[in-house]
Amino acid sequence: MTNLIDLHKTRAAIPGDLSGLQSDLAQLVGEPFRFARVSYGDELTLHFGDLRPAKSPKLKGKLYGAYVFGSRGSPWIVKSGSQSLVLTADLDGHPGEPVRKEDLEANPLIAPDSRVLAATAFVVKPANAHGVELRFSDGSTLRILPTLAEADDPADAALPALADWELASPAGLLSVGPGLTWSFAPSTRSGEQATG
């Protein structure tokens, strides 16, 4: 069966609606990888599609991909398709050697211009939350795992919930987590990217 997804409508998860989440991820398939950046809080962001200048005057000279995939504060793993190397962040046990932010950005282990072949959401049962795996044409793989819930500090009760991972696109912002929650908010103006 063929399905049409209207990316101009706001959508929120129906419990157990993994297919709806998968449909929103489909917009990333076929897009070329441009570069990786480590942002505030050591969050990994991958940039895809056409490069665009940042909209904020404070970020003048910085480029962003039309699609920006962010790990937020979640653990992630990048497996290179061309090298016997794996990068990890925020995984227990700290396997391997530390990598500087600059080294990661200079060598993200994913070949520039390799295309996204698959973007697959899955449920991580112990965390009762969504993870995601991106597969690239160079054989590389990115996997983002949800952040495990911790005991809430009463002072944190007023803070908004932080997504486990997000995809900003020309169509809008897909936010996933915490838990099995997710939402898609369309861009407010035609052609406006949700970040930058």
Regions found by a protein language model. Give the residues of each.
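Surface-exposed, interaction-prone regions used to assemble/regulate multi-protein complexes
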Residues: 1-196
